[in-house]
Amino acid sequence: MIRCIRLWSGPDGNSHFEEGVVGLQPGPRSDMLSNKFPITSVSFQETDADPKLGWHPDPARQLVITLSGALEFTTHDGRFSLRAGDILFTEDTVAGHDWNLLGEQPWRRLYAILGQATLVPFRPTAPHSAVARPESRKAETAAKTGAGL
């Protein structure tokens, strides 16, 4: 399974997160795969030193795929870490969060900007937050059924 953390701005004005995975279905050659879904644009970014951004929201609804490096995120809910291979599904465009690099390795990542209607095949595994958005249930259903991506 591919680890995925969902980060969002809640109706309470705070940032929240939950642990999960990318919903995958059996595919050819014993592979597991998700349905295809549209993205608006893709870019790469590398951060060598801790930028000390402080609390900030994300500029868009997006997937952030960590290629190398490790970091710790802080939200109003608590903290979580990302490592190479992890995916951050972020919809935190209002409340904000902070992050710090862990170790000496730069954080290399791919940003995949999503449309507002794009359903991401996120499946929660251990909800961290008691606050859940209605959209997460719709996305969870799509991930389970393989529909709507």
Residue ranges, per PLM feature:
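Asparagine-centered strand-capping/turn motif at beta-strand->loop junctions
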Residues: 100-101
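A short, N-terminal "cap"/entry segment at the start of jelly-roll beta-barrel domains
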Residues: 1-46, 131-149
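Short acidic-glycine-tyrosine-enriched beta hairpin
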Residues: 76-94
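Conserved short histidine dyad/triad with adjacent acidic residue
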Residues: 22-29, 40-58, 91-95, 118
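Short, conserved beta-strand element in jelly-roll/cupin
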Residues: 46-49, 57-73, 112-113
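Glycine- and charge-enriched low-complexity intrinsically disordered segments
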Residues: 114, 118, 122-135
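A short hydrophobic beta-strand segment most commonly corresponding to one strand
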Residues: 87-93, 104-120
